[in-house]
UniProtKB/Swiss-Prot annotation:
Lineage, highest ranks first: Eukaryota, Fungi, Dikarya, Ascomycota, Pezizomycotina
Name assigned to this protein: Dolichyl pyrophosphate Glc1Man9GlcNAc2 alpha-1,3-glucosyltransferase
EC category name: transferase
GO terms of biological process kind: dolichol-linked oligosaccharide biosynthetic process; protein N-linked glycosylation
Annotated transmembrane regions: 4-24, 64-84, 143-163, 183-203, 221-241, 253-275, 320-340, 343-360, 365-387, 390-410, 413-433, 447-467, 477-497
Organism (species): Coccidioides immitis (strain RS) (Valley fever fungus)
Pfam families, per the entry: Alg6_Alg8
Database matches in PANTHER family: DOLICHYL GLYCOSYLTRANSFERASE (PTHR12413), DOLICHYL PYROPHOSPHATE GLC1MAN9GLCNAC2 ALPHA-1,3-GLUCOSYLTRANSFERASE-RELATED (PTHR12413:SF2)
Pathway: Protein modification; protein glycosylation
Length: 501
């Protein structure tokens, strides 16, 4: 890869140096969450991990991630043993901060490795496109904001996802793709949203004869079954033996939470909530009944606290049915045409469906769409046209995660520079499509991108000057609703591109 400048390695080193400078930056409660998990896995036997509740930040990730925390705790002991004490809540010595921040950067090497494998897997004429897409992922503002300031380990996890996607490119490594994805599911269960795409693709491309779906390849079925079963047995087997599977299920899937998170993720339910809010003042004139008990608690994201003042209530069953329906649509094409591009497209559309229609979706889950889509964004200008509003909306929607003044220049300047650099570069690199571009989608993207600037200025600066500490939810609602429009518009655009390609 020496012919490309800057190289992936060079960018990774510069990015790591920049991230070290952010060590003293704002950190969210997720920092304490992971410190507490270090303490749990270090201090207690394995069978007690999912029962410990000294802190409110209980262990709610699958066993492999708990095992990763256990490994990190062995190193943490030599850095500052105090961070591993269960009762030492909200402990954040500088040694603890530096260790946990460094662990995020170190584990992100998985992403660098996966992107390097991705570039190597692409045919020579398209390697420059893969290189550009890989740099956009490595330098993603989303990963910078969520992992290196807010604090999480998404770079490591998405590295495993991308590696699994790359392994699915060749028939000879399809088995390893399925096993790698199984490992990912045992690290973080949010990737279950993508599991149907993997199931259909592996079934169609690996387990069944390419010339006839009625001729199964029994050898491949057995190998895949043994591989995937072995992974899940290693992760959950001990807990099944101890009779703790139900306890793990309660921790991993806390369905008592409300429809929307405290800050509305930019999805269909954010738009639904916005319409409900807008209808409240005009409801008496329209003769619409108002639920008085919902006026002060509309979708604040608290446990059991999801209610609408005007519009009908949304139940878990509704969100599940909508998510499943809109995931099945792209899977039909994947079943009929099981190639790698359709596989990545179906992963992206499954992520869209889960994000747009899912129950209690976090805004951080937008990366589940952006990063896989990045692998297809440069296929041609039609794909890029659908990607542009997603890139803008997805990254702007993350701004409320960092609400302190010190981080405002970092998140704003870095994100704007990334958008300008990569979207303009992508526009020059993306091939002209064989089919004509969608005129309305192009105009929508241009108008949508333009509106983002005044929105950022208002929400970050003007609102505080006008209202002080009042109406604090207004800029959040504007940001979420604006971003939701972009994500939905991008989804519709990509659905058109996917089914007409």
């Amino acid at each position: 890869m020496a012919e490309f400048f800057p190289s992936l390695t060079q960018c990774a080193l510069v990015a790591a140096a920049f991230k070290v400078l952010l060590f003293p930056a704002y950190k969210s409660t997720d920092f304490e969450v992971h410190r507490n998990w270090l303490a749990i896995t270090h201090s207690l036997p394995v069978q007690d991990w999912y029962y410990e509740k000294t802190s409110e930040w209980t262990l709610d990730y699958p066993p492999f991630f708990a095992g990763l925390e256990w490994l990190l705790s062995k190193v943490a002991f030599f850095v500052d043993p105090a961070m591993l004490q269960l009762g030492n809540l909200n402990y954040d010595s500088w040694q603890t901060i530096y260790f946990q921040r460094s662990s995020v950067i170190f584990l992100e090497l998985m992403l660098v490795y996966a992107l390097n494998r991705y570039i190597k897997s692409v045919p020579a004429p398209s390697k420059h496109l893969a290189h550009a897409a890989s740099l956009s992922i490595l330098l993603s503002p989303g990963l910078l904001i969520i992992d290196h300031i807010h604090f999480q380990y998404n770079g490591f996890l998405y590295g495993i996802l991308i590696l699994s996607i790359v392994l699915a490119r060749k028939q000879s490594t399809l088995l390893y793709s399925g096993v790698t994805f199984a490992i990912l599911l045992c690290l973080k269960h949010i990737y279950l949203y993508l599991s149907l795409a993997y199931f259909v693709y592996l079934l169609r491309a690996y387990c069944l004869d390419p010339n006839s779906v009625f001729r199964p390849r029994f050898g491949n079925i057995i190998k895949l079954g043994i591989g995937v079963t072995s992974v899940f047995a290693a992760a959950f087997g001990p807990f099944v033996y101890w009779g703790q599977l139900n306890q793990i299920k309660e921790r991993l899937f806390p369905f008592s939470r409300g429809l929307c998170h405290a800050y509305w993720a930019p999805n269909i339910w954010a738009m639904y909530s916005f319409v409900d809010r807008v209808l409240i003042p005009v409801a008496p004139r329209l003769g619409l009944p108002i639920k008085a008990d919902a006026l002060t608690s509309v979708t604040r994201g608290l446990v059991g606290d999801t209610s609408f003042a005007i519009l009908p209530e949304v139940k878990k069953e509704h969100t599940f049915a909508l998510t499943l329906f809109f995931q099945l649509l792209p899977l039909l094409k994947l079943w009929l045409q099981p190639n790698w591009d359709n596989f990545v497209g179906s992963i992206t559309l499954c992520a869209y469906a889960a994000f747009l229609f899912g129950w209690h979706v976090h805004e951080k889950a937008i990366l589940l769409i952006i990063l896989p889509f990045s692998l297809l964004a440069l296929k041609d200008l039609r794909y890029l046209g659908a990607f542009r509003p997603l890139a803008v909306a997805g990254h702007v929607s993350l701004f409320p995660l960092l609400f302190t003044a010190a981080e405002f220049p970092v998140k704003t300047v870095y994100t704007v520079l990334w958008l300008v650099l990569f979207l303009f570069t992508f526009e020059r690199l993306a091939p002209v499509p064989a089919r004509p571009r969608v005129f309305l989608l192009d105009r929508f993207s241009l108008l949508y991108d333009t509106v983002s600037i005044p929105l950022i200025v208002y929400c970050s600066l003007v609102h505080g000057w006008l209202f002080g500490g009042r109406m604090e939810f207004l800029p959040l609602m504007f940001t979420s609703s604006y971003a939701a429009l972009g994500v939905v518009g991008s989804w519709v655009g990509f659905m058109v591109v996917y089914f007409t390609s």
